[in-house]
Amino acid sequence: MAFWLAQERRSQESGFIQRFDPRFWTVDFPRPAMASAVTIGPDAIRVDVELHHEGELVGLIWESVDRFDHALLAYATDRDYSHTSLSFRWRSEGVIALDQPNGPTLTIEGRDEAGVSHTWYVRLWNYAEGSPTDAHITLAFSNLESGYTLPGTPVTPTDIDRMFISIVAPGHSGGSTVPLAERVNGHVVMSDIETGGARSMLDVGDVRLPVHGLRMATAYDDAYNQTPARLLRNIIGLGYRSDIVHYVGMSHFMRLERLGDGTLLADPSGTLCEPARAWHEAFLEQAGENDLEVIPSLSFELFDAYCPQEWKQRDAAGAPAFTGWVPPSTLLSPANMQAMGWLAEVARNIVGMLRAAGLQVRFQIGEPWWWVTSAGEICLYDDAAITALGGDLPNIGDLRKALDPASLDLLDRAGDLLAASTAGLAATVRDAAQGPAEILLLAFTPTILDPSMPEVHRANLPSGWAWPAFERLQIEDYDWLIEGADALRREAFNFVDTKLGYSLVEQDYFAGFVLDAEDAEDFWPRIDRGIDEVSARGVERLYVWALPQVTRDGYTRLPSTGKSDMQSFDDVLYPFALGRSSAVAPEFSTSISVTASGHERRNALWSNARMHFDVGPGIRSETELAELIAFFRARHGPARGFRISDPFDHSSAGMTGVPTALDQLLGTGDGVRADFQLMKSYGPGPEQQVRPITRPRGDSLLVSVGGVQTGDWTLGPLGVISLGSAPAEGAEVRAGFLFDVPVRFAEDRIDIAGINFAAGEAPSIPLIELREAG
């Protein structure tokens, strides 16, 4: 399907927003503080904070450059705030008041009149009218002064990068890690936000792309700093509909409680921290208002610093399971009843919010597994797991090695334990729903079906997950997808189908994921192609993971328009053999310029020749002439393509020879890639022309890998060979074949005069080669 990576807005729809629109503020803060911002009206925003240490500071941020919205929806960059004013009503509770030392301050980062980086600190109380907790504030940027008291240092308003308002706890001490006497929960409401002056409005992208059938996935850990309204604006504007899979994350949603030694750990009650609760309530409510369902997702992953030691999965040496994130997260043991109880209570709280928002209860259990380290060690040796699995467990030191029966049995029992834990979580969700509930399970196949560890599926894709354990099974394989490991993907699809038994209509697919922006140009085409491939399998619910990468890279999906008549192709052969009287003409397009010295400069505009045929001279009788006219009418003239056999070039062996499996080099194995385009090379050396072959004769095709002919392949559309397994690194993939040329009639009519034909005059019936993706 068509897509592009939009880097800027050109002629797309745009509009205007008021500068300082509440939807576009963000928050940020250091761990373990928590904060969120939600819009509570067209001119109002509320910030909730949960603070644990004297030095923690939450910033409510406005940036001159839009770093978070998709290019087609972003607001314009404008660093000049001169002659602009911002006014609002400030109300606060539980946080330090406006009139106090360290009270709310507008920190402005930019450059002074000399262009030197500078930071100004504008005390809001100096511009407030009212009480320290309920005041009206007006900030005229051309007249602002930095400092605790006025007069102060004038602010240069013409080159500002960003500004933020500080929100801290009473008793704040900058940089201090001393715990507060008790957790501080507070909030700030900025309402009646109004911008005036000469630069009070910003140009903003305002596209509403056609609905394309894909759905969106996002995560609170990626979006905690943005307002729910901003996320939903991007999702809807980019054409995503139906529902959103929303991962509640592993680091920002939980309430933390302090132990006697000062350590902050996840509250075993499963309570969400107040900022996360407020954010999710707003997100669910606003999604429902936009006819979007939300599928919350909860995983077994938890930020390591917040996880009690006894909850963690561990390897045989007792080391905790650590993911690759920095700082790391860990995995909860399915055997630990406290850990599973915490997950269950979190789920119960989330379901309660779904019901309060009037949304259907749909809930994803995301990627539950026993962690496997990079050394192949499986982490099922925590104390609770050892007890649950019977004690005195065999040490599975490396899943990449052959395993004895006792180890295989242990993996099976670990799988049963994992299945029991997910069944328990599902039961909690169903109970909390107090009515119908749809439970979905997400499985990440590159890990649980890693071919270097062929038995790990026993533990991490247990038979206890087989249908109908869950209403829907969701598959994610982004490691393989972005690597181009198509054979592994296909094998995994088939394995999962066989083992778990979910029909294709009961399966969903997650496509992604571009971690680094520099990989966008390479990875998004593979992701988009993978979406189409899975759709062709019959999977209807397709999700893009995840929104931050979509907006960062400008991924823009367009709906399918169906087959255009002008692009249609009838896979039929031209009904007459081309005789020697037929004309065949390869054509290139070349730009030739002559310099003042008389020398030519030549530039080939096409990498491949385009073939022209004149088949009129091959018509030998009035019967054939009648057939030709019928064939022309059936193709609607040049509207529909068809095959033709080139009498002078139709084989991989030379031009017309008998094919062998070694004729044409398609590529070299890398241990990952399994799909190869049929090609034919012309000429020797590095300057040879390589011609994609999109219309091979399937019954003539021969394939070899590493010089050995193989039958383990399938022929896909447009001449793509899919091998059953990826060729080893360095192995040559070759093929031999006969092929036809895709063509169309070159003109809208054919002129044939019966008297001329009877007199032996051949008509002219030109054909032109079609360029097909290949």
Where are these regions (language model features)?
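Solvent-exposed edge beta-strands and adjacent loop segments
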Residues: 30-35, 39, 567-632, 740-761
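Substrate-binding cleft of secreted/luminal carbohydrate-active enzymes
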Residues: 161, 168-171, 240-253, 293, ...
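Catalytic domains of carbohydrate-active enzymes, especially glycoside hydrolases
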Residues: 213-215, 219-262, 282, 286, ...
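The substrate-binding groove and active-site-proximal loops of carbohydrate-active enzymes
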Residues: 216-222, 262-274, 327-343, 408-418, ...
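Polysaccharide-binding and catalytic clefts of secreted carbohydrate-active enzymes
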Residues: 321-432, 444-461
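Extended beta-strand solenoid/passenger and fiber regions
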Residues: 629-714, 737-774
